[in-house]
């Protein structure tokens, strides 16, 4: 099934916009409202699975935490393994770590060293693309493990925050079900 304009509008309307959260001047796009609607949640997964069904994906990677909510069911739909990328100290085996910049400071993400094998073709799935910092760190981890990133898929793209351009500079195509301006 290819996404129709009506389906995408349904998904977009299922995402609540919360003004002045987490601080004044921000219009927060709340993907949890999509998760609360079983039809919207199922449709978002179905559309992503259909898009990547014949893309040769061997692993799906999701970034903590909401990337797990979308990435794991997409992996099941594709019949491939799901690999979590987590915050430091949450994975029990040996990990690769990647620091990345936040608006104020830095953070770190980790990936099990043996979760991605050389030659794996990886789809990264997350809930939202904004500036692309988290996804860039995730892509770097996958590449360090020997995998290649086929695409990065999102439910929401905040199109004016440069995340798509950042991914393109890394040689990664991005796809989003819906787009909003970022505030």
Curated annotation (Swiss-Prot):
Keywords annotated in UniProt: Cytoplasm, Glycosyltransferase, Purine salvage, Transferase
Pathway stated in the Swiss-Prot or TrEMBL entry: Purine metabolism; AMP biosynthesis via salvage pathway; AMP from adenine: step 1/1
Record field: catalytic activity: AMP + diphosphate = 5-phospho-alpha-D-ribose 1-diphosphate + adenine
EC number: 2.4.2.7
Coiled-coil parts of chain: none
Molecular-function annotations in GO: adenine binding; adenine phosphoribosyltransferase activity; AMP binding
Gene3D superfamilies (alphabetical): 3.40.50.2020
One Gene Ontology CC term in the entry: cytoplasm
Location of this chain's protein in the cell: Cytoplasm
Any Pfam family the entry gives: Pribosyltran
Source species, domain of life: Bacteria
Annotated NCBIfam families: apt, PRK02304.1-1, PRK02304.1-3, PRK02304.1-5
Record-stated family: Belongs to the purine/pyrimidine phosphoribosyltransferase family.
Protein's UniProt name: Adenine phosphoribosyltransferase
Species of origin: Erwinia tasmaniensis (strain DSM 17950 / CFBP 7177 / CIP 109463 / NCPPB 4357 / Et1/99)
């Amino acid at each position: 099934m290819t996404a129709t304009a009506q389906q995408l509008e349904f998904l977009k309307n299922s995402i609540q916009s919360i003004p002045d959260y987490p601080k004044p001047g921000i219009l927060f796009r709340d993907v949890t409202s999509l998760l609360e609607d079983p039809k919207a949640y199922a449709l978002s997964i179905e559309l992503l699975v259909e898009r990547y069904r014949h893309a040769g994906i061997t692993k799906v990677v999701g970034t903590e935490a909401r990337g797990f909510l979308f990435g794991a069911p997409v992996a099941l739909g594709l019949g491939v393994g799901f690999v979590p990328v987590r915050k430091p100290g949450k994975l029990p085996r040996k990990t690769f770590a990647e620091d990345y910049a936040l608006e104020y400071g830095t953070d770190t993400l980790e990936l099990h060293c043996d979760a991605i094998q050389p030659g794996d073709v990886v789809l990264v799935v997350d809930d939202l693309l904004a500036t692309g910092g988290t996804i860039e760190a995730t892509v770097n981890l996958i590449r360090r493990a020997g995998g290649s990133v086929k695409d990065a898929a999102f439910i929401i793209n905040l199109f004016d925050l440069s995340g798509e351009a950042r991914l393109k500079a890394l040689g990664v195509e991005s796809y989003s079900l819906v787009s909003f301006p970022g505030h």
